[in-house]
Amino acid sequence: MEIKVVKSELNNTISHNGKIGLILLATDQITLYEFDAILKDTGVLCFPSRVMMDSVELTPEVLMAIKNELASATKTILPGMALDVVALSCTSASMTIGVDEVARIIKQSDSKREIKEVTNPYSAIKKACEFLNIDELGVITPYSKEVTQGILDGMQPNIKTISAATFNNTNDNLVPSIHPNSIKDAVIEMAKDEKIKTIFVSCTNLNICRYIDELEKITGKTILTSNQVMAWDILRLAKYKKPILGFGSILEKER
């Protein structure tokens, strides 16, 4: 049988506003779930990979070891194609490794293609606070006290933490199971402190983005979360200007 070759038009119709490399932890269950909602219909599309982990217990040592997996994880994302942004989706790993080191490893992972920008939730929360003129936060995490303290210390000197709370759950397989009602209760309780104007819920593996609008209305505070600010920074770096509704006031603003 003769097989006929037919003409085809080549046109990027799914990621026309941005190709995003998204590096997830092996244990991550929530980032894609929340990004699918936030980035829907934007034409900014994420192409994920995952990093191996020495343990599901997020100790400083396990978080630091992720550094050794970043280059190989980046290389598996659309080999040979330019990426507008690559994001490491882990707040605590980005803090532990260092945001400059994360960016260096990712950008140098493949000399044969361009990676235009790099972000992560830890650098994104700092940029978001600068964008909103915020210099004080209340912080809620699922981490150990040790890792939580590292998050707080790394915010200094530009961002002061007024209050901090943790669910103290170091097993990252269990963090996604922390019920949204528990997270909401923690936010509402912290918001009772009149000195706190902004609350940051840290961790990309917490299921909270769909409740940000509700919490901002209940508390009258600005609510920021790891996936929300990372998505905001991705959109900013990809030069996507349109407002995103339903996931907090920061995404409704022009970037």
Can you say where each PLM-predicted feature lies in the sequence?
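Hydrophobic alpha-helical
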Residues: 186-215, 231
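N-terminal glycine-rich anion-binding loop in soluble enzyme alpha/beta folds
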Residues: 2-72, 143-179
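Conserved beta-alpha
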Residues: 105-109, 116-170, 252
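N-terminal glycine-rich phosphate/adenylate-binding segment common to multiple enzyme folds
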Residues: 66-110, 116-123, 198, 202-209
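Short hydrophobic/aromatic-enriched beta-strand-loop microsegments
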Residues: 44-48, 138-139, 159-166, 219-227, ...
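C-terminal functional extensions of proteins
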Residues: 224-255
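Short, acidic/small-residue loops that bind anionic groups at enzyme active sites
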Residues: 103-129, 215-230, 234
